[in-house]
């Protein structure tokens, strides 16, 4: 059995996987609550095969329950969401990772990404960045593309690459996934550098720079943990990005 922040999952006696999530009604948006199901239609993305689901409303509390059944992973989850040491990942793994993220961005959807179950909008991006980096005036996102929106090391497998837990996916600013994974890697500098290298086109775009500040704001903002080992690296990168945006 695997327990995560919002769900619990376990292997079944027919060699499939069932993931059960409990979500408050006020956290279910107008687009519904079928991320894993709708992600099954994505082309070119390595993910477990979706089999079916059951959804029900709690009789006693204002919450919904959802159980999704999928195929098994071609490996094990790489680790916790934020890693403290470098994982052993092959070059084949990194190629599959890059191919899947490229393919994901080529798909189309009407869904909107909900990182941390919060719908991402232009206003959210602007408020998040300016709340920590007020010197950044223009926070306009130019390109919105499909994103996993919870891309971290607990949601990918190895040695075989697969991307799972799709409940938050939808359109988001270009670079959202790359920046999210980079932030989850900052405690291991060599890993964070590899993520930036693999997704350099995303990070080099203006939207990618804004997403770098978006994730840095979460690490450096008022609610940040003072002992977070990522603070120093996030602050250093944020200073570089802010300077770059100000000079054009």
Predicted regions and their residues:
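A conserved long alpha-helix in the C-terminal portion of kinase-like catalytic domains
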Residues: 182-248
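Short, well-ordered beta-strand micro-motif
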Residues: 11, 69-71, 157
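Conserved catalytic-loop position in the HRD/HxD motif
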Residues: 145-155, 160, 165
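A conserved alpha-helical element in kinase catalytic cores
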Residues: 14-69, 76, 81-103
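An alpha-helical support segment within catalytic cores of ATP-dependent transferases
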Residues: 90-97, 103-149
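Active-site Asp-x-Gly
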Residues: 158-198
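Conserved ATP phosphate-binding architecture of protein kinases
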Residues: 5-11
